[in-house]
């Protein structure tokens, strides 16, 4: 299975990674084009475009200015250890063994507004450029136009290399829109996670994000090769509910947290 997840806004470039093993992003030429566009923006432009505070806008203007390949362990960090957020809390990369890292490299990909598609151990430098940003660029008026079919082609390439034809979408809608579903060369599975609140099961964003990370880790660890095997997922109290599920959207429920 090939798992797709979103990146995180929160970054950690302070703590050292647990391994020196690293790879390079495959779409750095395109990233450089976007950096060149972003360097034309003033902090005020960035604040307006990204709807962020002046402080965060200034930080990201500096990041765009400082962004500079080649990436090394001195000026960059592996994506899976740099991203911090609910999905990454669930994934818990800081406790990966060497064999689990190798499995992650094969079965996990991170969608990114700046880098397109990342392997977990790809080095990245700090940035903030969400996929939904309406950044005018040489290809159009937003990042979906910029990336076009490029990300989809890389997803298909990774899918072939990992051995089966199942893509598990654990990314947000904003990021998954960068993938052309009609061009995917495999079957697409989009798990749904619902938590019980006041007697009703519904998708609760915070819990669902962490659950996506838990499932990504489960796939990396257990290497399922069928949707049926995926339904055995049972981390942190979730369980498969056949009645609410469809063949392409397995539903996992969790009873109310006490």
From Swiss-Prot:
GO terms for cellular component: cytosol. Transmembrane segments: none annotated. Pfam families: H2O2_YaaD. InterPro entries: YaaA. One of its GO terms (biological process) is response to hydroperoxide. Belongs to the UPF0246 family. This is UPF0246 protein Sfri_2896. It comes from Shewanella frigidimarina (strain NCIMB 400).
